[in-house]
Regions:
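Residue-identity detector for glutamine
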Residues: 10, 27, 35, 72-73
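Surface-exposed beta-strand edges and their flanking turn/coil or helix-capping segments
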Residues: 5-9, 43-45, 70
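Hot-dog-fold acyl-thioester-processing enzymes
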Residues: 1-24
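HotDog/MaoC-like acyl-thioester-processing domains
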Residues: 37-38, 47-73
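A conserved acidic, glycine/proline-rich C-terminal tail/linker
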Residues: 21-54
Length: 73
């Protein structure tokens, strides 16, 4: 945007890049923690859960910008 924030939809697109290629998304939930700016580095942290994955995009100190949960049916 005009303030150089990362668009909320872009977080989800970035997180989806870390899912296995054959993973079919049935449900998605994003929890936004803080804003990232244009030149911020987003470090992915991926955890396998019972019915899918949680992808957390974090800053260099490990603080989350967003956690996105992707579930299969």
């Amino acid at each position: 945007d005009t303030n150089h924030h990362v668009n909320n939809g872009q977080y989800v697109n970035i997180a989806m890049e870390y899912l296995p290629g054959d993973f079919l998304i049935h449900q998605m939930r994003a929890v936004y923690k803080k804003q990232a700016f244009l030149d911020d580095m987003l470090h992915p942290y991926v955890v396998s859960v019972e019915s899918g994955y949680v992808v957390s995009l974090r800053d260099e100190e490990g603080r989350p910008y967003v956690s996105v949960e992707f579930l299969q049916q």
